[in-house]
Design a protein with these regions (language model features):
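Q-loop/switch helix immediately C-terminal to the Walker
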Residues: 90, 96-111
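ABC ATPase NBD coupling module
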Residues: 58, 70-85
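The feature captures the beta-strand-to-loop junction immediately N-terminal to the Walker
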Residues: 37-39
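Walker B catalytic motif
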Residues: 163-164
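Hydrophobic anchor residue at the start of the ABC signature
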Residues: 148
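Conserved beta-strand-loop-alpha-helix hinge in the C-terminal portion
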Residues: 213-236
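ABC ATPase C-loop
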Residues: 151-152
Length: 242
């Protein structure tokens, strides 16, 4: 089982007496891009926050194993030290920090060459952005790209990308997918969370989520077909059809 980086076993999470995640099972292999596909409200982001260890997303049942270590109740800071990072769907602004400082936060020590490489990877000229401040003068698309650049610069073991294609103006989907492939080629395992089935063309494997649970894990094309033919048209019938 050395090739398995992340394993989720029977994970359930309640909010106000209602399950937002129910009996989730998932296996992600080291070095792969694993796509999690589902409609808005399927539980994808909740699963991402649970894996990251966010305060309000500690599971009621089940386990999260990272490199076969049980991290279910490990604080978010400890998970970050293990090499897990999350690119939020709504990027954190960190008002007042220079972009170069923000990109160096996950590094043992600031590395100018790596920061410049990360900015170039997301099509932001280093000369124009290195010394800019992370503030409201940046557009939503710029903040999203800076968030992705921060993950790229960290070179984590596991990068959880929550809807990385949303809110991006100048960076096309193909550019984003190319960046994700570069992350994986550099040794980072990627969990790609999306509601766009076309984003899965870069994935090595995939899972389909609906109503807070993983309904299917396996071949990318089969996941895309289920999503296109059933989930978009009849989300309430999908669970019964599988």
């Amino acid at each position: 089982m050395d090739d398995i980086l992340l394993r989720i076993v029977n994970l359930s999470l309640k909010r106000n007496g209602r399950y937002i995640l129910k009996q989730v099972n998932l296996t992600v292999r080291r070095g792969e891009i694993h796509g999690i596909l589902g409609l808005n409200g399927a539980g994808k982001s909740s699963l991402a926050y649970a894996i990251m260890g966010c305060t309000d997303y500690i599971p009621d049942e089940g386990r999260i194993l990272f490199e076969e270590r049980d991290i279910t109740h490990l604080p978010i800071t400890e998970r970050a030290r293990l090499g897990i990072t999350l690119a939020w769907q709504e990027p954190a602004r960190f008002e007042g920090l220079r972009v170069s400082t923000y990109l160096s936060l996950g590094m043992p020590q600031p590395d100018r060459a790596r920061i410049m490489e990360a900015l170039e990877a997301v099509a932001l000229p280093p000369s124009a952005y290195m010394h800019r401040f992370v503030d409201q003068t940046l557009s939503g698309g710029e903040r999203k790209r800076i968030e992705l650049a921060a993950v790229y610069a960290m070179k984590p073991k596991l990068a959880i990308l929550d809807e990385p294609d949303s809110g991006v103006d100048l960076l096309s989907l193909d550019d984003i997918l190319s960046l994700i492939r570069r992350m994986a080629d550099g040794g980072t395992t990627v969990l790609l969370i999306t509601h766009r089935d076309e984003a899965l063309k870069v994935a090595d494997s995939a899972s389909l989520m609906c109503q807070g649970t993983v309904l299917y894990q396996g071949e990318v094309e089969q996941v895309r077909q289920y999503y296109a033919q059933r989930c978009r048209l009849h989300p309430e019938m999908l669970k019964a059809s599988l």
